[in-house]
Amino acid sequence: WEKIKSLKVAYITEKLSLDSKEAQEFWPIYNEYEEKRHELMRKEHTQIKDKLENSDDLSEKEAKKLLTLKIAIEEDEEELDKAFLIEVSKVTSAKKALLLLKAEEDFKRDLIKQYRHNKGGK
């Protein structure tokens, strides 16, 4: 996991052409965002997805409660994303905030491609 994280840091730094001042301000914001994002994913997993494993036993009342929770988590994610992009654009630029979105998608795609290539080669 640490290797992937360090590859991602290098990839994003290169794609955004962050200078040392920008990087010094950007990475703490990014790391905090990633942690909050993971917290929301863990919350969704533990409070919703685990319960869906036994969906045959799920009552309509419980399902409504889980659906409400799912919507609330998605709203929290959306607010987190908006606040993050605004903050990133302040310490870098609006253009770099947009480039970040592309860089993250490209990194994921490249990582999956690499995984499939290595898996197929074994």
Regions found by a protein language model. Give the residues of each.
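General structural signal for secondary-structure boundaries
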Residues: W1, S59-E60, H117
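Amphipathic, charged alpha-helical segments and their helix-to-coil junctions
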Residues: S6-L7, K15, E74-K122
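Acidic, low-complexity proline/glycine-rich segments
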Residues: W1-V9
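Amphipathic alpha-helical segments
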Residues: K8-V91
